[in-house]
Each structure stands twice: as structure tokens, then as C-alpha cells.
Amino acid sequence: MGKCCRMLIFAAIAGIAVLYYQITKELPKPNIPLDTWWGPGKPQNVDISIRPFKININNKVIENLKLKLNDVQYTLPLEGINFEYGFNTDSLKKIVDFWRTQYNWREREALLNKYPHFKTNIQGLDIHYVHIKPQVSKNIEVLPLVMIHGWPGSFVEFYKIIPMLTTPRAGYNFVFELILPSIPGYGFSQAAAKPGLGSTQVAVIMRNLMERIGFKKYYVQGGDWGSMIISAMSTLFPENVLGQHSNMCFVNTPSSNIKAIIGSFFPESFAGTGNAHKMYPMSEHFFTLLEEMGYLHLQATKPDTVGVALRDSPAGLAAYILEKFSTWTNRSWRSVKDGNLLLKYNIPELLDNVMIYYVTDSITTSMRLYAESFTKAHLALNLDRVRNHVPAACAKFPNELAYVTDCQLAEKYKTLLQSNDMPSGGHFAAFEEPGLLAEDIFTAVKKFKEFYSKKAESQKKADL
């Protein structure tokens, strides 16, 4: 081999090494302002008190809804097509008919008001949240836990799991005080009047909300956008977050993606025998995701355009939202006539979630979170490459949209204390499998507490 060839090979190896270092090195935590004003106009003095809130929708809104439901125009579905093209029209007719003739909003409204609701102004926006304080004996420790929903969900998703997390259970000497906020622009939380409110900025609002309520330290939990927001909270505010639990663990770094590609050559060794099919073959999963991500491209680019149609048509809104509750719960349900919606849910609870979007006119503003989180400026924050040292736990439900191995998660989460492959369930874990999720949260927080106890003991010995 000639000297010139050896030099070229050496240069190539050195170049690859430098490139690998550049794409894998830890990045510093970005400086995110804590007081950005997201309300209309210039910053001003506002009422920062915590105000009790009760859902009480004007009768005119409900009457207008009924008028629209009585005048829905349908397109005949294709022969032999179930949910492959989206929400099947024959199934939609049944949902709309129930909504029009049997769904009683006032009864459902009373159910939603079962727990205390509040609003408070954070950075110019009135933020809504549900706050549940458990009534337990003095020997039971009460731990603050903020649970953050995603799209197209809402705080309604958590109603089944509330009693499971606030009631003492065998083997644990603690329960949770729950704070369930609505993301800005979702439901009863005011939407930003200015561009730029991405998931990272929402994390700042949630941190400020918890401080307003009176918590300096707390645990966080979330799925979908909630998982992105709590990850940002843990990354930016490790002094506040004691531990994070996610039912949609995700990381998107160059090195984690390289690992996934290398893993495709020995999938069972990389992902595990029982999980390899959730990642590989990569081409098959890529096209499946491509099939399901059309909504994301629309919402990340033109949310206001699609929002006009969804805001004006309650039937269209229901179809758009409930199709996700079918396909994201189990992708195989696309081949079922009714999307198997009623296999895990009932129509009233599904419509409760749709109604939160309808009565608050928040479908457009909710979708803007996609547009704001996929801007060049937001992506340039590169939070996935800022290491997160807060104790973390991951509940991997088998029908989640994507599977990520612990090897990949380790790129981001340096203190991953628990990672469980769940026996059943999909994207909407709290709504579909509240019992499984609740138990996983309890076991995770128990490990978090043990982690801090051992850390304190080690520090105590070191100080002697």
C-alpha cells in the first residue's frame, strides 16, 4: 500500500472520528427565558391569584351543536374499506347519532366537575388545571405529581386513573397529590397570542405553574406531548423535578438513530426477542409511520387551515380525533369496520374528550403546538442532546406508535431506573390501561425514593 493511500485512509478514519464526536457530544443546556409574555399585547400586570373554576358551558353552544349534528352530510365509504382510509363513515353515523340523541352534556359536565378545577395566569396566559388532594392518614406520605396530556387528548384522559393514584395500596407508604394541567391552547387553558410557544416553552410554563401552586419539588408524568414536556422540564429544571415517568419514551439523536440502523443487522440481540418486531424490518415500520404521520405534517405546517374545517364541523372534529383513539390504541384495528373503538372505550367518555375541544374552540390552537415545536429555532435547541440526569422510568406499551430500546434511551436519560415492557395497551395508556399505568408509576416512584435515600447515605458517609 502506497504512502498516499495510507494517508487517505488515516484522514478518512480521523474525519469519521471527528464527525462521530461532533454528533454525539453532550450539548450545554440552552438558556430559556422564564418570563416570556405569551398573552396579547405588551406585558402587563395581571391577577396572579389561583381562582376556582367550574365548567359551565353556555346553553347556546349546546343548542348550536345539536343543530349541526342534525345536518351532517356524509360521503359513502368505499366497499371493503374499514378504517384504512380514516374514520369509516358508517361508524361515524352511529357515533353522531348517539351524540345527537343520547349524549347528555349536562350530566357529563357534572362528572367532569367532580374534581376541583382552577385557573391562574402564567406569563400572560390563564392556565387551567385539575387539582386533587388525597384524604389519607398521617402515616401515608403525599407526593406531588403533575400529569400532562397530549394531542388529541385532554385532562379527561386521567379521570380513570385519579382514584388509583390517590388511594393507598399495599406495599407503598405514599400516594399522590395530582395536578392535571391543560397545555396552553388546549381545552380551558388560554392559547398563546404570539408565535414561538413550543413544547420547551410549555415546560417553562408548567414549571412556573407548579411554583405558583406552591411546589418547589415534584414528580412528573406524561405521554405524547406530555412526554416531551416533562422531558424538557427534567432537562431544564433538575433542581425541581424529583423523577419523571413516561409512557412514551422517545429520543431522537444522531447516535441513537445510528444504533437503530446497526441494530437492524441483528434485531433480536439489539431490541430483544420479544420486541424486535416492534422496530424491524425498518422499511416496514417506516412506511407504517409514514401512513400515520399525515396529520403531523398538516399540523406542523398549516394548522390554521385544517383548523377552520374542524372548528366548524363537530362531526368532522369527532372523526379526526376519534380515528386516533382507534389506530393509536392498536394499528391492527384499521382493518375492523368500527375501528374497535368500543373494545377499550365507551362512546360517552370518547365524546367527553371531543367536547373539550369543541366547547372551547381549541382544536386550531392545540394543533399549533406542532407548528411551534417543529420550527428551525425550536429544533435548534437540541434538547435531546442535553443529558438528563433526573431519575427516569419508562412504561413501554406494546401498541405504542414506535419502540425505543433502553440502549437508545441511555443517550438522553443517564439515570434510567426502570423500563418495563407492558403486557397490553397503546398510545393512550391512562385512558386505556389505567391500572397498569398506575402500578408502574408507583413502582417507579418507589425506586426514585430509594435512589435518593442511597444517595443521601453515600453523601453522609463521605462527609464523615
Swiss-Prot record:
It is a single-pass membrane protein. Its main location: membrane. It is found in: Microsome membrane; Endoplasmic reticulum membrane. GO terms for biological process: catabolic process; epoxide metabolic process. It comes from the Eukaryota. InterPro entries: AB_hydrolase_fold, Epox_hydrolase-like, Epoxide_hydro_N, Epoxide_hydrolase. Keywords: Aromatic hydrocarbons catabolism, Endoplasmic reticulum, Hydrolase, Membrane, Microsome, Transmembrane, Transmembrane helix. The chain crosses the membrane at residues 7-27. One of its GO terms (molecular function) is cis-stilbene-oxide hydrolase activity. It catalyses: cis-stilbene oxide + H2O = (1R,2R)-hydrobenzoin; 1-(4-methoxyphenyl)-N-methyl-N-[(3-methyloxetan-3-yl)methyl]methanamine + H2O = 2-{[(4-methoxybenzyl)(methyl)amino]methyl}-2-methylpropane-1,3-diol. Its EC number is 3.3.2.9. It is an enzyme of class 3 (hydrolase). The active site is at D224, Y370, H427. Developing oocytes, fat body and midgut epithelium of adults. GO terms for cellular component: endoplasmic reticulum membrane. Belongs to the peptidase S33 family. Catalyzes juvenile hormone hydrolysis. This is Juvenile hormone epoxide hydrolase 1. It comes from Ctenocephalides felis (Cat flea). The lineage of its organism: Eukaryota, Metazoa, Ecdysozoa, Arthropoda, Hexapoda.
